[in-house]
Amino acid sequence: MARHPGLLLILLAAVAAVATTSRAQWVGGWNVIEDVAGNNQIQRVGAWAVGKHNQLGTNDRLQFVRVVAAEEQVVQGSNYLVVIDAASSRKKTRELYVAVVADLVGATTYQLSSFKLATK
C-alpha cells in the first residue's frame, strides 16, 4: 500500500480548519442578529409572538414594546429566538420574555414554539 504524506497533511489541515470554525457558522447553528432595533422583520416577529401569546388565553395580556436581542437558526426556513420587552396591563410592569418562533419554508404564518418570562 502506497503512502501519501502530502494527502495526510491536506487532510489534517482541513480537519483543523473545521475544528476552529465557530458553531455559528454551521448550518443549524444559532447566529446573533445585529442591530435588532433597526431590523423591521425581527421587530415584526416579536410583535407577532406577543400577539399569539395573548391569543392563547393567558392572563398576561402583554403589550409589545420592542425586541431587544435576537438570534436566528437556519434550518428548513428559520427559527428566531427573540428577547422581547413587553408591558403587562395586569401587573402594570414591563418585563423581558424569551420566545422561539419558527418561520418554516412553505408555511403561511409563523409558529410559536415557546414563550416564557426571561430568567435573570
From Swiss-Prot:
Gene3D superfamilies (UniProt xref): 3.10.450.10
Motif Secondary area of contact positions after renumbering to this chain: 73-77
Function: Specific inhibitor of cysteine proteinases. Probably involved in the regulation of endogenous processes and in defense against pests and pathogens.
GO terms, molecular function: cysteine-type endopeptidase inhibitor activity
Subcellular location: Secreted
Family under the similarity heading: Belongs to the cystatin family. Phytocystatin subfamily.
Entry keywords, A to Z: Plant defense, Protease inhibitor, Secreted, Signal, Thiol protease inhibitor
InterPro entries cross-referenced by the UniProt entry: Cystatin, Cystatin_dom, Cystatin_sf, Prot_inh_cystat_CS
Highest rank taxon of the organism: Eukaryota
One BP term from GO: defense response
Organism, scientific name: Oryza sativa subsp. japonica
A Pfam family it matches: SQAPI
Protein name per the record: Putative cysteine proteinase inhibitor 11
Cystine residue pairs: none
Annotated site (Reactive site): 28
DNA repair among keywords: no
A single Gene Ontology CC term: extracellular region
Position of the signal peptide: 1-24
